[in-house]
Amino acid sequence: MNTIVDRFEKIKSKITSLKPNKTVNIIALSKTFRLSYISPLIEHGHLHFGENKVQEALTKWTDQKKINQNLRLHMIGKLQSNKVKDAVKLFDYIHSLDNQKLADAIAKHQKNLNKNLEHFIQVNIGNELQKSGIPVGELDAFYNYCVNEINLKIIGLMVIPPIEQKPDKYFKSLNELNKSLSLENISMGMSADYIEAIKYGSTFVRVGSSIFGSRS
């Protein structure tokens, strides 16, 4: 058998064998997959799922979250300002917080909707021009603004390393930045490198193709 549940359980076993110091949460990246395809994993009892487009997530998960209030949705893609209200309504975690305008919009809608999401600050640790994320040199000031000025709940940092390079040095750097801010969680590692990410302290890994297969 090679169902999505089988593949998920194999990943869980691999993670357990690493004996991580902290609990590692597997975010099943369900973006682009129909709910009918994902359902066996929900029925298996898995609760953490990731999406990168707000509109797709609304269509897929709004009713499902009413049925199962224990589901936890993670926004892992770039969040546009005009989608923030809907995102705050639906999601439990945002992994792509990286600028003051977005932070202000989230804080405003959280207050209006009486929500308190958990957030990761995305760091552009590879200094890639085309990639989202706050520059390392601006991280401390942005973190302090989010926490002390607008009362966002920042639980950790997030990184997507440059594709063409080995991720280890970026994972190590993010771990050090995370410790410097005394944060408990790290969002890093995907299907190709989640094992390495966990070795460097990741507590949330974002796994898609290793569970669901290739996207058409």
Residue ranges and their predicted role:
Residues 1-185, 190-192, 198-200:
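Conserved alpha/beta-domain cores
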Residues 198, 211-216:
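Expand to "…catalyze enediolate/carbanion chemistry for C-C bond making/breaking, isomerization
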